C-alpha cells in the first residue's frame, strides 16, 4: 500500500473505484472496523470496559464493527448512539448485528460521565465534518475529552471528531485522541500543524483497495 494524502472528495472516488472493482462498501466497512480493532488490541493485551461512540453515518458504522469484534473477544462494550440510530444502509446492517451480542446500547451520554472505561472509540464524525459542532456533537466530544482526562485511551476512527478533513480546522470543543486509525490514505488533517497533534499516533490501515485501482489525481 502506497503512502498518499487525499482529500475527502478524493477518498470517496477511491471507495467508488474499490466498489467498481468488486469490493463492496459493506466489506470496506468491515475491513476498516477490524483494522481499527486490531490496533486497539495492540494497546490492550486483556479486554476491559470499552465505550464506542457512534454517529449516524458510516463512521458510526465502522464503530459498530469495532464494537462487535470487541464484544466477541470478551470486552464489556457500551455503544453510545450519540445522535440516534444509524441512517446509512451499511451502518444499519452493522448496528443490527450487535443485537445478538452482550453489548450495552446507550442513548444518553450524560449517564456515562461518572463511569470508567479502559478505552473509548471515537466514531462520531468522519471525513464529511466541517464547520462548528452542533450542541449534541459538542456534548459528545466533551464526554470523550472528559473520559480521556480520566485516563481512558482514545482511538479515533479516521479523525478525531470536530476536525475538518481537508483544512485541519479544529472546531471549538473537538475531541482529542491517543491513536487515530485512518484508512487507505492519509488525509490533510493528519499532517496539518493545527490538527496533527490532536490525532496522537496516526496509523493508516489497508482496507483492501489495491493500488492499481486508485484513480489518478
Model features per residue range: what roles?
Residues 6-9, 23-35, 61, 89, ...:
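Conserved active-site and cofactor/substrate-binding residues in soluble primary-metabolism enzymes
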Residues 13, 23-24, 48, 113, ...:
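Hydrophobic alpha-helical context, especially transmembrane and signal-peptide helices
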Residues 2-9, 117-217:
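YjeF_N-associated NAD(P)HX repair module
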Residues 1-46, 210-217:
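Positively charged, low-complexity intrinsically disordered leader regions
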Residues 9-13, 17, 21, 51, ...:
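Generic alpha-helix detector with strongest preference for long hydrophobic helices that associate
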Amino acid at each position: 500500500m502506497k503512502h498518499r494524502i487525499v482529500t475527502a472528495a478524493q477518498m470517496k472516488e477511491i471507495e467508488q473505484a474499490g466498489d467498481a472493482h468488486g469490493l463492496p462498501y459493506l466489506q470496506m466497512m468491515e475491513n476498516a472496523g477490524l483494522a481499527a480493532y486490531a490496533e486497539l488490541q495492540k494497546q490492550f493485551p486483556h479486554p476491559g470496559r470499552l465505550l464506542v461512540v457512534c454517529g449516524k453515518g458510516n463512521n458510526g458504522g465502522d464503530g459498530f464493527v469495532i464494537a462487535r469484534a470487541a464484544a466477541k473477544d470478551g470486552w464489556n462494550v457500551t455503544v453510545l448512539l450519540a445522535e440516534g440510530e444509524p441512517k446509512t444502509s451499511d451502518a444499519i446492517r452493522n448496528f443490527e448485528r450487535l443485537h445478538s451480542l452482550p453489548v450495552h446500547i446507550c442513548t444518553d451520554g450524560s449517564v456515562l460521565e461518572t463511569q470508567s472505561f479502559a478505552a473509548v472509540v471515537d466514531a462520531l464524525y468522519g471525513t464529511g465534518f466541517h464547520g462548528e459542532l452542533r450542541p449534541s456533537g459538542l456534548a459528545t466530544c466533551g464526554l470523550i475529552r472528559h473520559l480521556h482526562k480520566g485516563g481512558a485511551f482514545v482511538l479515533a476512527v479516521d479523525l478525531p471528531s470536530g476536525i475538518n478533513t481537508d483544512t485541519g480546522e479544529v472546531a471549538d470543543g473537538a475531541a482529542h485522541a491517543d491513536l487515530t486509525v485512518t484508512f487507505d490514505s492519509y488525509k490533510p488533517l493528519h499532517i496539518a500543524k493545527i490538527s496533527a497533534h490532536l490525532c496522537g499516533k496516526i496509523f493508516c490501515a489497508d482496507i483492501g483497495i489495491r493500488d492499481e485501482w486508485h484513480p489518478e489525481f
